[in-house]
Amino acid sequence: MTTETRSLFSQLPAIDRLLRDSAFLTLRETYGHTRVVDLLRQMVDEAREMIRATQALPAWCDNWACEADARLQKEAQSALRPVINLTGTVLHTNLGRALQAEEAVAAVSQAMRSPVTLEYDLDGAGRGHRDRALAELLCRITGAEDACIVNNNAAAVLLMLAATASGKEVVVSRGELVEIGGAFRIPDVMRQAGCALHEVGTTNRTHAKDYRQAVNENTALLMKVHTSNYSIEGFTKAVDEAELVSIGKELDIPVVTDLGSGSLVDLSQYGLPKEPMPQELIAAGVSLVSFSGDKLLGGPQAGIIVGKKEMIARLQSHPLKRALRADKMTLAALEATLRLYLHPEALSEKLPTLRLLTRQQEKIQVQGQRLLAPLLAHYGEEFAVAVMPCQSQIGSGSLPVDRLPSAALTFTPHDGRGSRLETLAARWRELPVPVIGRIYDGRLWLDLRCLEDETRFLEMLLK
């Protein structure tokens, strides 16, 4: 060991001495004695390794408490951190999809803080059913005879098939064999449910006769799958649910539909593209309809199945139902969200998903102009900052080809170097509340459609 190395080692403080410092007393109170001691040992080891490798002390050796505090704060951050979503995708799967209404947040908080009547019947003072209250709401909204709730729509499809068609064939149009994120494929789900897939038609055209010709003594279901995350256009033909129900009645075969995203209101009244609604399919005679809770419905992650009472009873009694059931927090949030649909006049204000989807481009443009001056003053030396029109998307596989006119704050490096955009985006991701945008066409875009808290946004970006 050289004299210089020995001298550097001698400058490393004893852990006991550091722990007596007032700053470390505060850290010990906040994070616990054991964790602080473990971290200091780790930091001393790191310093020793650096001395051996570089004959130098780490820069943070001038202020051990500050470095320890920074590390402990970062370590204590939740894995599920709040972010400001300015990607232009309203229902962003990677960012948690639908924001919950205040009523849903309050309901979840109450369910977490107190025992609740999850499976308790107050009238009979005995065991109740966890789906009952929500089933009544869903029947009221959709016109269905009964309903069943599980933890997501993939689970809903799995349960629907396993409980009604295991060991038998399910007839589906080839153009509806969808794959969603995470390689969830309808044919794979059918195999897991114990069903045999019977494809009919072609990718772009399926006729009523294709379904009729496919039915045999082993057919359990005729199935429709709404292609909510892609669109087939041009020379196309499909059989709608009403016609398929007519075929099913003729052949005594139930019809089921997986709607995917699923909307409980006619979106066209808000100037949005119309999506098929569960209540329309129930009215057409479909036996079971499944859809998501956390997409266009605007609630928590859940799989919802509505339909005929005898079919729902088969789902409720299947062993998979217990494995896939929703917990009390999900049910509390979903009930509160569904109750908002009983007051449709206030829905576009109270339901965050609908509120964000229906924001007008003109208002978003005004918001951008309001935010422009402080951002230009802060970033103007390196970037040209402007407000530009852009196109938002709904996301989560909903209405994939439709776009929503919006406005964005854009940042373009004066020197044209794309690396500056990557650096800026990375810096924003490291903020206490990360700001997430998107880079394309030589600019960093912050689509303002989902920005409601301007104060927090400016507080982050002007740091």
UniProtKB/Swiss-Prot annotation:
Pfam families: Se-cys_synth_N, SelA. It is an enzyme of class 2 (transferase). The keyword Transferase applies. GO terms for molecular function: L-seryl-tRNA(Sec) selenium transferase activity. SUPFAM superfamilies: PLP-dependent transferases (SSF53383). GO terms for biological process: conversion of seryl-tRNAsec to selenocys-tRNAsec; selenocysteine incorporation. The modification N6-(pyridoxal phosphate)lysine is found at K295. It catalyses: L-seryl-tRNA(Sec) + selenophosphate + H(+) = L-selenocysteinyl-tRNA(Sec) + phosphate. Its cofactor is pyridoxal 5'-phosphate. InterPro entries: PyrdxlP-dep_Trfase, PyrdxlP-dep_Trfase_major, SelA-like, SelA_trans, SelA_trans_N_dom. Keywords: Cytoplasm, Protein biosynthesis, Pyridoxal phosphate, Selenium, Transferase. It is found in: Cytoplasm. Its main location: cytoplasm. Signal peptide: none annotated. GO terms for cellular component: cytoplasm. Its EC number is 2.9.1.1. Pathway: Aminoacyl-tRNA biosynthesis; selenocysteinyl-tRNA(Sec) biosynthesis; selenocysteinyl-tRNA(Sec) from L-seryl-tRNA(Sec) (bacterial route): step 1/1. Gene3D superfamilies: 3.90.1150.180, Type I PLP-dependent aspartate aminotransferase-like (Major domain). NCBIfam families: selA. Converts seryl-tRNA(Sec) to selenocysteinyl-tRNA(Sec) required for selenoprotein biosynthesis. HAMAP family: SelA (MF_00423). Homodecamer; pentamer of dimers. Binds only one seryl-tRNA(Sec) per dimer. Belongs to the SelA family. This is L-seryl-tRNA(Sec) selenium transferase. The gene is selA.
